[in-house]
From Swiss-Prot:
Part of the 50S ribosomal subunit. Forms a bridge to the 30S subunit in the 70S ribosome. PROSITE patterns: RIBOSOMAL_L2. SMART domains: Ribosomal_L2, Ribosomal_L2_C. Residues 228-273 are annotated as: Disordered. GO terms for cellular component: large ribosomal subunit. GO terms for molecular function: rRNA binding; structural constituent of ribosome; transferase activity. Pfam families: Ribosomal_L2, Ribosomal_L2_C. This is Large ribosomal subunit protein uL2. The keyword Glycoprotein does not apply. It comes from Rickettsia akari (strain Hartford). The gene is rplB. Disulfide bonds: none annotated. Belongs to the universal ribosomal protein uL2 family. Signal peptide: none annotated. Keywords: Ribonucleoprotein, Ribosomal protein, RNA-binding, rRNA-binding.
Length: 273
């Protein structure tokens, strides 16, 4: 999809760059595949802020996405491509031959009227879902499972994909966009193609208010706070902080490694760049 620029008839339109969504479905989502979603404002069950800079934003309906693709050997036709406010990628409404509807992540170049299927015998075609052991090396994939039957977890964001680079000893080796090489069981499923909306990385919201519509509050710098609020706070005049960058709780930030999960490190062949 292309990007839209606007004539600067107001200050907020001068820098605004949006993804052109004119080709997407303009109606409401399918009611049976939606449910309400409540806002947390970044607070946990004790009312304390656990995720900073969240709050407000437009009301949303959650679209129930099928990440598992468990309807095996049943063909489905793409009814429409839709916008989803809960994720960066677009979604596709598909209708199976038995009449059931489902939402899936829409890959690039998937069009209305295309047929998709989840099967070990499916063609290597955009939108089809297969176990990794039936997919040829060199194929571009998205929505890749990490545990058999759990549903896709890798490459679900706009424009993302992974490459299948090898198979050996019951595992497939995939290359992620981060440069990481990872092992995934060959029985895990993946979908052919790259995720839609690759131009999202080039958008410019143009004004602070659009960030508020999306549920993001202002991000205050530590050096602009008082000493009681942040290790970088205080000082006379514009002080630069006086120490290496740290979080509000004093832990190093800006590049400090934070990964703690040693249990799955054995599946990482090469760390990300």
């Amino acid at each position: 999809m292309a990007l839209r620029n606007f004539n600067p008839i107001t200050p907020s339109l001068r820098e605004l760059v949006q993804v052109d969504r004119t080709s997407l479905w303009k109606g409401r989502p399918l009611k049976s595949l939606t449910k309400g979603i409540s806002k947390t404002g970044g607070r946990n069950n004790q009312g304390r802020i656990t995720s900073w800079h969240r709050g407000g934003g437009h009301k949303k309906l959650y679209r129930i996405i099928d990440f598992k693709r468990n309807k095996i050997d049943i063909s489905a036709v793409v009814e429409r491509i839709e916008y989803d406010p809960n994720r960066t990628a677009f979604i596709a409404l598909i209708k199976y031959e038995d009449g059931e509807y489902s939402y899936i992540l829409a890959p690039q170049k998937l069009s209305v009227g295309d047929r998709v299927m989840s099967s070990q015998d499916a063609d290597i075609k955009i939108g089809n879902c297969l176990p990794l052991k039936f997919i040829p090396v060199g194929t571009t994939l998205h929505n890749v499972e990490m545990k058999v039957g759990k549903g896709g977890q890798i490459a679900r964001s706009a424009g993302t994909s992974v490459d299948l680079v090898g198979k050996d000893s019951g595992y497939a080796q995939i290359k992620l966009r981060s440069g990481e090489f990872r092992l995934v069981p060959l029985d895990c499923k993946a979908t052919i193609g790259s995720i839609s909306n690759p131009d999202r990385k080039n958008i410019n919201l143009g004004k602070a208010g659009r960030n508020r519509w999306l549920g993001w509050r202002p991000h205050v710098r530590g050096v602009a706070m008082n000493p009681v609020d942040h290790p970088h706070g205080g000082g006379e005049g514009k002080t630069s902080g006086g120490r290496h960058p740290v979080t509000p709780w004093g832990f190093p930030t800006k590049g400090k490694k934070t990964r703690k999960n040693k249990r799955t490190s054995k599946f990482i062949v090469k760390k990300r760049k």
